């Protein structure tokens, strides 16, 4: 048997006797044979190599919504759009020599969403919802083989302001988001506020609601870097990107953490 480039593989992982975690369907795009010993390495990607998803395109969208743009691209590639998307008006947005997935990721991130393609699904995840969910597991220092955690004030802001003047009506739209970091996070032991900086967001908005969403999303996106780190531990299938964990007995860095990237190696 020899797999063909473009064939698909369905991957599940976990422990014998336990429920397996479905990792989705992958398209084979590279096969490598090496020796000694005889080893065959099969590499694949989550999006089909036969799809036009990676073709760069330039075009504009006018008088539409984020959900409509996502739906249009999903239909173009015969994907099922999964996830709840707020009714966000967009006067105009331009795709500049970008792949459809790259463009959607850029656009969605401005409004607080993450985008990925899994098999035949285009999945939108609301980041604020992910941050508010319950942790899937508690971890103590003895559960972890190695860890590195960092607490910083770099790229941390007290507020974010969006300001845009509509060319059609000359109306100035301004919105300021405040309180993106907790008071306990903003203070040092001496009681000093660690960041009083304001984030200026230069972005086109269609109305006050879209300005609010962009300001809140930009503030949350920057301030999530205040505390970040990495953990290495024995394989745990439920620890996937988008889930939360709770660190226990890690001192001031204890508490809930959102998983942004997970790598499982065998």
What is each stretch, according to the model?
Residues 25-34, 59, 128-131, 258-266:
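Short, compositionally biased
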Residues 4-8, 21-23, 37-39, 76, ...:
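Extracytoplasmic
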Residues 50-72, 82-106, 110, 233-235:
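Short acidic/polar beta-strand-loop edge motifs in secreted extracellular
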Residues 1-49:
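Assembly/oligomerization scaffold segments
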Residues 1-4, 144-266:
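An acidic/polar, Gly/Ser/Thr-rich interaction patch typically located in mid-to-C-terminal regions
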Residues 34-37, 64-82, 206-208:
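Glycine-rich, acidic and aromatic/proline-enriched surface loops and short helix-turn segments
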Residues 39-48, 85-149, 153:
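Short beta-strand-centered interaction patches in the first periplasmic/extracellular domains
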């Amino acid at each position: 048997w020899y797999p063909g480039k473009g064939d698909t593989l369905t991957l599940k992982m976990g422990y014998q006797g336990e429920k397996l975690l479905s990792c989705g369907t992958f398209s084979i795009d590279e096969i490598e044979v090496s020796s000694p010993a005889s080893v065959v390495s099969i590499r694949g990607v989550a999006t089909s190599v036969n799809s036009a998803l990676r073709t760069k395109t330039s075009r504009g969208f006018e008088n539409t919504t984020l959900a409509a743009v996502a739906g249009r691209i999903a239909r173009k590639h015969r994907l099922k759009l999964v996830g709840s998307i707020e009714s966000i008006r967009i006067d105009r947005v331009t795709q500049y020599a970008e792949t459809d997935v790259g463009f959607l990721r850029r656009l969605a991130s401005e409004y607080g969403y993450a985008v990925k393609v899994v098999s035949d699904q285009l999945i939108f995840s609301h980041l604020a919802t992910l941050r508010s969910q319950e942790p899937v597991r508690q971890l103590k220092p003895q559960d972890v083989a190695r860890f590195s955690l960092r607490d910083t004030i770099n790229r941390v802001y007290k507020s974010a302001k969006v300001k845009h003047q509509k060319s059609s009506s000359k109306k100035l739209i301004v919105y300021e988001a405040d309180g993106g970091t907790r008071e306990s996070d903003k203070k040092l032991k001496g009681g000093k506020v660690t960041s009083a900086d304001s984030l200026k967001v230069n972005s086109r908005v269609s109305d006050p609601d879209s300005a609010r969403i962009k300001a809140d999303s930009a503030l949350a996106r920057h301030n999530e870097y205040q505390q970040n780190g990495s953990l290495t531990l024995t394989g745990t299938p439920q620890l996937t990107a988008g889930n939360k964990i709770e660190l226990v007995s890690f001192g001031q860095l204890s508490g809930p953490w959102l998983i942004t990237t997970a790598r499982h190696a065998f």
